[in-house]
Amino acid sequence: MIKLKNINFKNISVVLLFFIAINYIFFTYRFFQRENGYILGDWLINYEGGFVRRGFFGETIVNIASILNLNLINLTFFITITIYLIFIFLLFKLIFSKKITFIIALIIFSPATLLFNFYDPLAIGRKEVLFFLFFIFYLFFSKKNFFMFCAPLLSMGITLTHELFTFLLPFFFVNRYLECDSFNLKKYKTEIIIALFSFITFLFII
């Protein structure tokens, strides 16, 4: 009988991440090209008819496509896939920088997290991936000086793209608490800045 402690969860994680990425690319392409106009349309909400919620990304990408004379659907597909692959790559690095136990692997690859896309392909290609990418950027770079400059701008941009970001802000504070095991506000400067800019932006769009 194979014991759990003898299983290399990092190698299993690499294989799973590979198939998750392939699955995401395949279904995103199908949805964007022919099968689900709603998912593509959500990314392309813009300010053509006036200021609306979730329009920042769409306004940006529509203008880029217009200026560079690019196919809007293909450009959107390329950018969303790039966002997801960067997330997968950083998650891969995070996994290999930590000791992966059975419990951690189970949490990462449970049907409620990354494997949810296999159970419900219609969840693929959603804007929520922006939160996951920003959060993993935060895990890697929150102690870097450049992140303190970029974080407010990114938090505002993501909130203007999907207001759900504001409701996920507690994850940043929970992570900091788990790191320092303290409620000293001086240690939460990055999290407070992210929350402040996101919340102000949220108040502006509601």
Stretches with model-predicted labels:
Residues 21-34, 55, 187-206:
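Membrane-lumen/periplasm interface segments of specific transmembrane helices
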Residues 25-41, 48-60, 162:
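Extracytoplasmic catalytic/substrate-binding loops of multi-pass membrane glycan-assembly enzymes
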Residues 48-82:
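Short hydrophobic/aromatic helix or loop-helix immediately within or flanking a transmembrane segment
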Residues 55, 103-133:
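Aromatic- and kink-enriched transmembrane "portal" helix at the membrane-lumen/periplasm boundary
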Residues 78-100, 137:
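Transmembrane-helix motifs of polytopic, lipid-linked glycan transferases
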Residues 135-148, 182-183:
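Membrane-interface transmembrane helices that cradle and orient dolichyl/undecaprenyl
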Residues 147-172:
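Membrane-interface alpha helices of multi-pass inner-membrane proteins
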Residues 169-197:
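Perimembrane helix-loop-helix junctions
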